[in-house]
Amino acid sequence: MSFLRRHGLSILLVTRSEYFCLRGWPLRLVWAVVVVFLGWMYPADQSFADHLVQRHNLKCSQYFPCPSALRPRVEFWIDVYGRWTTKDAILHDAQRPHRVFKIIKGKACGIKSNTSYIKEQKRQIRLKLERIATMIERKQSITKAKDRHYLNMFPGRSPSVIRRAARNLRCQSGNKDGFRNALRRFGTYGPIVRRVLKDAGLHQDIQYLPFVESSYNPEAYSRVGAAGMWQIMPRTARTLGLELNATMDERLDPEAASWGAARYLKDSRKNLTVAARSKKPNVTDSELTPFVITSYNYGVNGMRRAIKKLGPDFLTVLNRYRTKKFRVAVKNFYAGFLAARHVAKNSGHFFGTYSKGRPLRYDTVILRSSVSIDRIRSVFGISQSRLKSLNPALTRFVWHGWREIPSGYSLRLPPRQGGWANKIAYLRSLPPEAGRGTPKRYTVRSGDTACAIASAFRVKCRDLIDMNRLGRQAVIRVGQSLQIPKRISG
């Protein structure tokens, strides 16, 4: 007997000799043989199903290609975003993520209480794979259903490949519930992103990139210092023209950050096109798109080096390029983008009915002079929480009253019937505020530390570090002038 598997269907084929052999058997006995055979091929335990990654009707485009060799990787991430939840741990091959060995329900990766259990599960899988590799080398028969399940993931049956997979076991949590929340935020911020992309002349489907970067969370921070919906690093922000100082961090503003991301992606395509044409003069935009998207994670220079070494063939780079930083997150970035694009475009299929956030609407007034947040609240009669939701670029030094909103800032206000003209005129008629917006300063002396200075002025060390952008190590130097934040009253 043999199997023909096409489009998710399993058809039992019987050879001519087997047919004549079975023809004389009682029908019940024939069906018993079939059931036993199917049970051997498809064990009932979900953790050992024939293939734990589902097939999806993935529709790509000429601009965003997904070659057949990349599709299994994309389908894995579709399941991460649209099928498995944050309480599921998926044990898989880091180099071939679609090679899923086991799904553990209720045991998310990265949770301290789950560490020992997941570690033991990985150990068992590793031992099983190593045993299978040894059995192949010794030309021993592999008859156990669970062993055959693992073996079927390696069509070439290469012991070295199997052992490599055993060394590359990785735990990936699902994110279906997180993606549902991202879709709600997408309803709020998606229109802003689409407008920016249109004005910048970029493809509209780039709107799905923040799903991968931050789950469309404009308040997201990473462990390495990236911030906002587009996860922009501080140094990159400044090169993209974003304000980043004690009063403003435009990485947290969806519109400003989207313009920054658009500038980055346009520059990336321009620079990578030059690099690619040096290797392949007739390279197409479609061929470059995976490199441009991946550069958002890995950097333009990193992608340029990969192209110069191996040429503008993305699959070749994916499989053969080797550096310390070209690892799991980078290799899966484009596939993750395609997966997020597919899940978001087919959200009804994956999530059914869900609540969508309302598009962000606001009026804007350009401040002619610096002004405190207290005065803004008083003049316009708007709560601080409402103002904060519309003006996320303003830092906590502004919200705490330590610094004024700078002149020239485009202040966003909630829409109002009849507009805000009378309130704006009143604001502009008021005299300057005294004693605000100019914190104390201190000149660093020998032996000082940031936290010792903060203690002397009875302010939080973290506030002093953040206000002066001292970085994670809080390095200061003799003669440096530091701004001292005001203390919060009460």
Which sequence ranges carry the predicted segments?
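Extracytoplasmic and endomembrane cell-envelope/extracellular-matrix remodeling and assembly machinery
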Residues: 145, 149-192, 199-200, 239, ...
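Bacterial N-terminal signal peptides
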Residues: 28-40
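N-terminal secretory signal peptides that target proteins for export/translocation
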Residues: 1-24
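Aromatic (phenylalanine/tyrosine) cluster motif
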Residues: 3, 19-20, 37, 42, ...
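An acidic, Gly/Ser/Thr/Pro-rich helix-cap/linker signature
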Residues: 48-200
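Short, surface-exposed glycine/acidic/tryptophan-bearing loops
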Residues: 220-241, 408
